Design a protein with these regions (language model features):
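Acidic (Asp/Glu-rich) catalytic motifs at the cytosolic membrane interface
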Residues: 20-43
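Hydrophobic alpha-helical transmembrane segments
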Residues: 1-21, 45-49, 54-125
Length: 125
């Protein structure tokens, strides 16, 4: 771990929390069904009100990873592409109505991943 640059750790945090945000979006969509069937997803255990804040925390952590890693513009892009999903998280929509949140989160992960890759390769020295 001593040979791995700090920037790589911060980008790893961002990538990991993007994946967690996608999982959380999926689990938020299924909260009611999971609670009825006895599934113990984190979102089902937390309930909708706390689960939406966990989703926000994932987005905040991925942005923090980029900012601390020196890629603040990627953090700004991430906020922009995740914003529609964040709005849905705080809406009254439930179940299948939250499917767009899952799709937006997946698309956002792809976009932010591409921006990260482009940024990485254009700043190599």
């Amino acid at each position: 771990h001593q040979n791995i640059p700090a920037k790589a750790w911060w980008f790893g945090l961002a990538a990991g929390t993007m994946a967690c945000a996608l999982l959380e979006a999926n689990n938020m969509r299924d909260i009611t069904g999971d609670q009825v069937s006895g599934k113990k997803t984190l979102a089902a255990r937390l309930g909708r009100d706390k689960a939406k804040w966990l989703y926000v925390l994932c987005i905040a952590m991925l942005c923090a990873g980029f900012v601390v890693g020196g890629q603040w513009i990627t953090a700004v892009i991430a906020v922009a592409v995740y914003f529609p999903a964040l709005k849905l998280a705080f809406s009254n929509k439930q179940g299948r109505e939250l499917l767009p949140m899952l799709m937006i989160s997946a698309r956002a992960q792809l976009i932010v991943g591409l921006v990260t890759t482009i940024t990485f390769f254009t700043t190599l020295r």
